[in-house]
Amino acid sequence: MAELTISTEEIRGALERYVSSYSADVSREEVGTVADAGDGIAHVEGLPSTMTNELLEFEDGTIGVALNLDVREIGVVVLGDFAGIEEGQRVKRTGRVLSAPVGDAFLGRVVNALGEPIDGLGDIPNEGFRELELQAPNVMSRKSVDEPLQTGIKAIDAMTPIGRGQRQLIIGDRKTGKTTVALDTILNQRDNWRSGDPKKQVRCIYVAVGQKASTIASIKGVLEEAGAMEYTTIVASPASDPAGFKYLAPYTGSSIGQHWMYGGKHVLIVFDDLSKQAEAYRAVSLLLRRPPGREAYPGDVFYLHSRLLERCAKLSDEMGGGSMTGLPIIETKANDISAFIPTNVISITDGQIFLETDLFNQGVRPAINVGTSVSRVGGSAQVKPMKKVSGSLRLNLAQYRELEAFAAFASDLDKASRAQLERGSRLVELLKQPNYTPFPVQDQVVLVWAGVEGKLDDIPVGEIGRFESEFLQYLRHKHEGVLAQIAGGTWGDEVIASLDAAISDFKKLFLGKEDELRINEPAAEPLAGEEDRETVTRFHDDATDRPAGS
């Protein structure tokens, strides 16, 4: 029988090999507990290493974002259904800061405030994630606004032009056409998109905050019908969403846009509207027990909007030359632009377009108040032909409004004042525009030139709309080269002479047709018994149509 021997060296070697190959699978996890919850807010105790804006996960899988970092607890805004969150539940850190997925696949899609698709068209492949709380480009990364962003709206492109990288506020009471102005601007980018030229193309983002779901659906329908959805992303946070989603939606849209801007592309983003975002932020702040300030808004409500709108910029050539143009919308009460939120946003932006209820009700649409609307930086980006023809337009309209108010009390006016009133009424009529019908820049230049130079003074006010549409049609058929020259930025004596000749020829046709309609109609038959004493005449007057007299 063999003798059993124990080798201590072998045992020691085996133990050393085992110890050296051993790795402890230990994971460290911070866990907190819900102290109280309600109204979409949870206060969590524990989790001492939590970062601001870090995502936290509750027991049922619901996500929340840490906004308040107090000594004893964390104030968390729940992003989702908070009905299942109860006191005592466990909460754990994710280590991820609030961010949104980005990429070209978002064009043509509708997403929520977290960048998740809600249009039923499946998942969206992303090119990465971008934090919602990103710093705006610094001073050295920017350059002056020098490229125009055409809205297709005559009154805006002529008097308050917008440049790529500008922040232009659209402000007014409810139901004054604010959203329509923004949508017209999106629709007007269609030809640029279809040109295929990256320098011309503008990607659009429409952020809907606190609107009815049916309204958002109708806006999507308008964009689809016009063929504009292919270059547009809708970030929707309807009225039914919790306040946290409404507060975050504009930042999500901005993050998607910044991804394209830093890629050297041009972006247009519409925030519709920031009044509702401020109200949602107020609700969240009060529930988090932050001290209220003016109108119960928290002290940092200015920073809420400034850090959002400062992301809109025109980047320098070294940074790729991309841009993000912002059109924030603010709703006023009784045309009061001196309220807290309107004055905040006016001071942040580069100009404002003020829409007035009285003008809207008078049929002046878009209802732009020329006196209070201004563009501080867009003038340097305005196309040269428009800059040359629209110089006196704002002054003419301002003088017209002043004279109009005076004429209401004055019984008689001198000839010059009457002429100014006549021209002003035609300019107002000329700047009217139907919904969702943006004008190409060359058409705008021709019409503004005709109005400012008095070429429409002998056209009846009621016929201005028909005259402009028929005249543009006439130019496209007979003088297409002139329109092409204007579109290319050419404006000089030769172009003016061609337009002079064209409008003179067309007015003969137009006014001749008017005379034919009015003068060559059969005389009215006299009533029975009045054959011997009634005379019916027909005549034409340049300014007005007078009734038949006896």
Curated annotation (Swiss-Prot):
GO terms for MF: ADP binding; ATP binding; proton-transporting ATP synthase activity, rotational mechanism
Record site: Required for activity: S373
Binding site for ATP: G172, D173, R174, K175, T176, G177, K178, T179
Membrane topology: Peripheral membrane protein
The EC number(s) this enzyme carries: 7.1.2.2
Record's keyword terms, sorted: ATP synthesis, ATP-binding, Cell membrane, CF(1), Hydrogen ion transport, Ion transport, Membrane, Nucleotide-binding, Translocase, Transport
Region described as Disordered: 521-550
Similarity comment: Belongs to the ATPase alpha/beta chains family.
The name this protein goes by in its record: ATP synthase subunit alpha
Gene transcribed to yield this protein: atpA
